[in-house]
């Protein structure tokens, strides 16, 4: 029978790049919509919700996707990753609720934080299925999911905010959008992958369970936690490093200034998404080169990745220097452009 043939690294990168470009563009579009339909305070509330939930979710995710995609020797089944992710996500949501109440956030702000936490929980489950597709270099299907999620999220946020005039209904639309993509596309990706490998006469060891059900074997879960815990801690610290300025900014100056800061800073986030797409596409190939002791191919690919990332960074700096103020005026509002100095 024919063996499974992965799509080329170039096509994987193309799919991932296009998917992440559309998704990051739509995320940026959410800030634009809130800036156009609302005000900087509304942008600030949304940003605060992301800032409060991010460290908790980053820690609870334990970077399982990276471990999953680089598990070239299949030490764990997909079901193990899914089982652990459900446990950690189930623990993260009450922690977000406790932080929201303990820090004194009330009313609209508290509701937005909790809703964003729930949306991030749904996203974390999708992330395990993305890891499965990425591990087997099926980036096209993962990219399609992201390309559907981005525009649908933007549409639902826009409709909810426009009709109600409140960010709460906009964020609720975001939750609905992410739940729909998880149920109609991401979860069925497991069966799609099984069917694809079955038709090609090859079932990888990582899909040995044949069902997309979580597996909770205490010994396996414990080993996976100890393996991934350092990565989770590092990602939490990275998230805190990025978000602590937002906490202090909101506390000392208010949500308006936080909203302006978020709008300006998102241009950097958009650039990081492109670099992330590059790394995501190449990571499984790098892992195989490393596991196969192919040092020459590993170093060549790594050098190419670094060169592309540097070129993208320099391009972003040039655009900001030449037309930063004009871009902010057109995309957001004139009041945002005065902060370019």
Predicted segments with their positions:
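Interfacial transmembrane-helix starts/ends
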Residues: 9-10, 44, 73-87, 221, ...
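Hydrophobic alpha-helical transmembrane segments
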Residues: 110-117, 144-195
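Helix-loop interface residues and adjacent transmembrane-helix termini in multi-pass membrane transporters
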Residues: 37-40, 75, 106, 136, ...
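Interhelical loop/hinge segments that connect adjacent transmembrane helices in multipass membrane
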Residues: 1-5, 9, 140, 144, ...
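Signature of the first transmembrane helix
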Residues: 8-62, 93, 150-154, 226-255, ...
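Membrane-interface junctions at transmembrane-helix termini in multi-pass inner-membrane proteins
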Residues: 6-10, 66-76, 121-148, 168, ...
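Helix-loop junctions and terminal segments of transmembrane helices
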Residues: 57-76, 135, 264-293, 299-305
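Interfacial segments at transmembrane-helix termini and the short loops linking adjacent helices
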Residues: 40-41, 100-116, 255-256, 321-341
């Amino acid at each position: 029978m024919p063996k499974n043939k992965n799509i080329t690294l170039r096509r994987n990168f193309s799919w991932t790049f296009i998917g992440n470009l559309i998704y990051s563009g739509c995320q940026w579009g959410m800030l634009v919509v809130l800036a156009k339909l609302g005000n900087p305070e509304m942008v600030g509330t949304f940003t605060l919700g992301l800032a409060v939930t991010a460290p908790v979710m980053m820690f609870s995710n334990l970077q399982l996707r990276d471990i999953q995609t680089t598990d070239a020797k299949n030490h764990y089944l997909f079901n193990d990753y899914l089982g652990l992710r459900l446990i950690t996500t189930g623990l993260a949501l009450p922690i977000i609720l406790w932080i929201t109440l303990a820090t004194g956030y009330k009313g609209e702000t508290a509701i937005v934080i909790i809703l964003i936490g729930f949306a991030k929980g749904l996203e974390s489950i999708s992330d395990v299925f993305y890891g499965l597709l990425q591990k087997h270099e099926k980036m096209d299907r993962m990219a399609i999911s992201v390309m559907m999620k981005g525009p649908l999220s933007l549409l639902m946020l826009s409709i909810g905010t426009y009709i109600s005039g409140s960010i709460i209904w906009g964020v609720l639309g975001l939750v609905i959008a992410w739940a729909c993509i998880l149920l109609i596309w991401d979860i069925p990706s497991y069966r799609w992958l099984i069917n694809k490998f079955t038709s090609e006469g090859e079932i990888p060891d990582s899909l040995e369970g044949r069902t997309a059900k979580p597996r909770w074997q205490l010994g396996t879960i414990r080993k996976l936690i100890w393996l991934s815990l350092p990565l989770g801690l590092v990602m939490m610290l990275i998230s805190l490093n990025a978000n602590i300025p937002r906490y202090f900014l909101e506390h000392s100056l208010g949500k308006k200034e936080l909203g302006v800061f978020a709008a300006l800073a998102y241009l950097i986030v958009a650039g990081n998404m492109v670099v992330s797409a590059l790394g995501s596409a190449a990571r499984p190939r790098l892992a195989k080169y490393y596991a196969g002791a192919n040092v020459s191919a590993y170093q060549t690919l790594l050098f190419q990745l670094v060169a592309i990332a540097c070129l993208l960074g320099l391009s972003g700096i040039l655009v900001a220097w030449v037309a930063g103020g004009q871009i902010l005026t057109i995309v957001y509002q004139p009041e945002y452009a005065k902060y370019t100095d």
